[in-house]
Swiss-Prot record:
Its EC number is 2.1.1.61, 1.5.-.-. GO terms for molecular function: flavin adenine dinucleotide binding; oxidoreductase activity, acting on the CH-NH group of donors; tRNA (5-methylaminomethyl-2-thiouridylate)(34)-methyltransferase activity. Pfam families: DAO, Methyltransf_30. It is found in: Cytoplasm. Residues 1-241 are annotated as: tRNA (mnm(5)s(2)U34)-methyltransferase. Keywords: Cytoplasm, FAD, Flavoprotein, Methyltransferase, Multifunctional enzyme, Oxidoreductase, S-adenosyl-L-methionine, Transferase, tRNA processing. The lineage of its organism: Bacteria, Pseudomonadati, Pseudomonadota, Gammaproteobacteria, Pasteurellales. Its cofactor is FAD. GO terms for biological process: methylation; tRNA wobble uridine modification. It comes from Histophilus somni (strain 2336) (Haemophilus somnus). This is tRNA 5-methylaminomethyl-2-thiouridine biosynthesis bifunctional protein MnmC. Signal peptide: none annotated. It comes from the Bacteria.
């Protein structure tokens, strides 16, 4: 359901990889690299177009990633272009590629050995965690961003969605021979290529098959034949000579990029959502000012001493599972980046154990196991195996997430913000912004002292206080109080090797081997931050009751070492929403959407025109991360930065709809229910 089938290949006598699934070569026996350069780079006139290109980024989409040779070659070419034309407005290349049967990393490395000129790029690609999971995975290179979509292109290409209409500059129409892969080469593919292509967008392909040519012409492309590569007589290339048209399938969820003139952006917040949004925007060259109401950063929900880090692998909505899995791997990527930059923070990728401590949790974990995740993501273990993983005896089976673990959120957030200040981030603490007003193409921010600050774009990332403004007051967000207990370690508890999850969690000892974090209470609509003796006791009771053993031979004495008597705890107030899914994107204009969509149920039924969603111009938000901010914030911040800059988004359209800030209103309106 979520994993995809890996490729099965062999090398023929010419050392060319051959697919067993399609019984076809991945590229020419003659010279795969020369073929790639001739067919795709020259066929799309890339170098000539880049020289005169006036936008900040260029987008290439490829219909078959295969060995990654086209990606390596064009990334290398773009690097040469940036070195030769360093003052060009074109700064970045986006490469979107689809792959139904991904090659295992070992085989990629084996094939790339024949192209030593790409050794550094290949190493960087293979260093990333290329998990064969359905959907998009984003990987960063110096001047190039790779969005690699695993799964059938028939399913994934439509998930680029309405947002990507008229945004792709060039297509590498690649894949196995049309006669051997007819499921991909069809009219629907060509129509979607046309839909996503910019006016004057191009395509090129190695084939000259009549059915392909006719399909591309029928879709709207002007198609030309050119000399084929090597022994091939002809191949095709073409252009979209058409006026851009807007044909939106779900206008009520359509995201809108910012109108960027000066790239001057304000972020209101001070936690992990603000951090990753600032990081992604700074990498794009934005001028960022952060406004935090506290004297220090990370004093609220992002301020715990230790926090568990792992994906949510079970949910009634599969969109949420796909989102959290991709968010988890992207967060791992960003944490590794931080470590390489020398940013110090306590962490341990020691794995996370999920306990089947009662019937409900056992059913939940059985469902997770049924998805057949790779063992690098999830392992189903009996009680002996799970006990071995955590280093302490357990009387229950469960699951294990090997790449999960814990990190110190407050330390990570504060130290990474300090690093971002070196990149140009301006931080204003003790600045509570009380009002937002849009006038003269700028947002005017007013603080408690009635001082004002002007910025072109504003991002709200201030947790449950997002709703403090007139523009956001109707969003259905609420505060959730959480008390995390800090307990001393013991000879027994020092043996804990992995994060332990039940109806709560217990972390291994911190780096000083002095204490553990035991969490956490969950009190809705409560933003009180005073210590609670009751919640402290409940944190203790949950672990002792959930994991208590009925087996008298089982030595569970370590549970008695859970000592809360020192009454040390930290209280944070998280932000959540009823469906417990984050919100990210444009801030919706509530009153205007109520007016525009009051009759949307009948408009859809009659197939009448429906306007795009009314939104506050250049105002965005990221919030409701709940207790999973360590996992979700990095990908949400990256997606929001991409949206602001009108770049491709690293999430499928169905997930983006599920993250939309107006989703609760729209769901009611689409059913014919009035909202107030």
């Amino acid at each position: 359901m979520f994993t995809v089938t890996p490729a099965k290949i062999y090398l023929n006598q010419e050392k060319t990889p051959v697919s067993e699934q399609f019984n076809d070569v991945y590229f020419s026996n003659q010279d795969g690299l020369a073929e790639s350069e001739y067919v795709f780079q020259q066929g799309n006139h890339l170098w000539e177009r880049w020289i005169v290109y006036q936008e900040k980024h260029f987008v290439i989409a490829e219909t078959g990633f295969g060995t990654g040779l086209n990606f390596l070659a064009v990334t290398s070419l773009f690097r040469q272009f940036r070195q030769q034309y360093s003052h060009s407005p074109l700064k970045h290349l986006f490469f979107i590629s689809f792959e139904k049967y991904p090659l295992p990393k070992v085989q990629l490395q084996q094939i790339h050995q024949f192209y030593p000129q790409f050794s550094a790029l290949s190493q960087q690609l293979c260093d990333y965690c290329l998990e064969a999971i359905q959907g998009c995975q984003r990987f960063h290179f110096a001047e190039t961003t790779l969005d690699l979509w695993f799964g059938d292109i028939v399913d994934n290409l439509p998930q680029l969605g309405d947002y990507m209409q008229n945004r792709i500059d060039a297509w590498f129409l690649d894949g196995f021979s049309p006669s051997k892969n007819p499921q991909m080469w069809n009219d629907e593919l060509y129509q979607q290529m046309f839909y996503y292509s910019k006016p004057q967008g191009t395509f090129s392909t190695f084939t000259a098959a009549s059915a392909v040519r006719k399909g591309l012409v029928s879709a709207g492309f002007e198609v030309q034949k050119r000399k084929g590569y090597g022994k091939k007589r002809e191949c095709l290339c073409g252009i979209k000579n058409a006026i851009p048209q807007q044909n939106t399938k779900a206008p009520w969820y359509l995201s809108q990029p910012a109108s960027l003139l000066s790239e001057d952006i304000a972020i209101i917040g001070g936690g992990i959502a603000s951090l990753f949004t600032a990081l992604s925007l700074l990498k794009r060259g934005a001028k960022i000012t952060l406004y935090c109401e506290d004297e220090q950063l990370a004093l609220n929900a992002s301020g715990n001493k230790q926090g568990a880090f792992y994906p949510q692998l079970s949910d009634d909505d599969d969109r949420n599972i796909r989102f959290y899995v991709h968010a988890f791997f992207y967060a791992l990527q960003q944490l590794q980046w931080a470590i390489k930059q020398g940013i110090e923070f306590e962490h341990e990728f020691c794995g996370v154990a999920l306990c089947a401590y009662d019937h409900k949790s056992a059913v939940k974990l059985a469902k997770i196991s049924s998805y057949q995740w790779s063992k690098s993501l999830y392992q189903n273990l009996n009680k002996e195996q799970l006990s071995e993983k955590i280093g302490l005896p357990l009387d229950c089976a469960g699951g294990f997430i090997p790449q999960g673990g814990w990190l110190a959120p407050r330390q990570f957030v504060q130290n990474t913000f300090s690093y971002l200040q070196q990149l140009g981030l301006e931080i204003k603490t003790s600045q509570k912004i009380t009002a937002l007003d849009y006038r003269n193409l700028q947002w005017v921010l007013t603080n408690e002292q009635n001082e004002t600050f002007n910025h072109q774009v504003v991002v709200l990332a201030n947790g449950y206080q997002i709703t403090d403004f007139v523009q956001t007051a109707k969003l259905p967000l609420y505060p959730v109080r959480g008390q995390v207990s800090q307990i001393p370690t013991s000879a027994n508890l020092l043996k804990l090797k992995s994060v332990l999850c039940y109806d709560g969690y217990l972390t291994p000892a911190d780096k000083m081997k002095q204490s553990h974090c035991l969490g956490a209470s969950h009190i809705r609509n409560n933003k009180d931050r005073h210590f609670s003796h009751q919640e402290q006791r409940e944190n203790q009771q949950k672990i002792q009751q959930n994991l208590a053993s009925t087996d008298t031979d089982k030595n569970m004495d370590w549970l008695q070492d859970i000592d809360i008597s020192a009454n040390i705890a930290r209280i944070g107030v998280r932000c959540s929403v009823r469906d417990r899914v984050p919100i990210m994107g444009n801030v919706p204009h509530f009153e205007q959407q109520c007016l525009d969509y009051r009759n949307i149920f009948n408009l859809r039924r009659r197939k009448q025109p429906i306007p795009d969603a009314a939104q506050w111009k250049n105002l965005y938000l990221i919030g409701a991360l709940g207790s999973r901010g360590l996992t979700s914030a990095a990908l949400l911040g990256e997606t929001l930065a991409s949206l602001i800059y009108a770049e491709p988004l690293p999430l499928s359209e169905d997930i983006l709809h599920n993250l939309s800030p107006n989703r609760s209103w729209i769901r009611k309106l689409l059913k014919g229910t009035e909202i107030k």
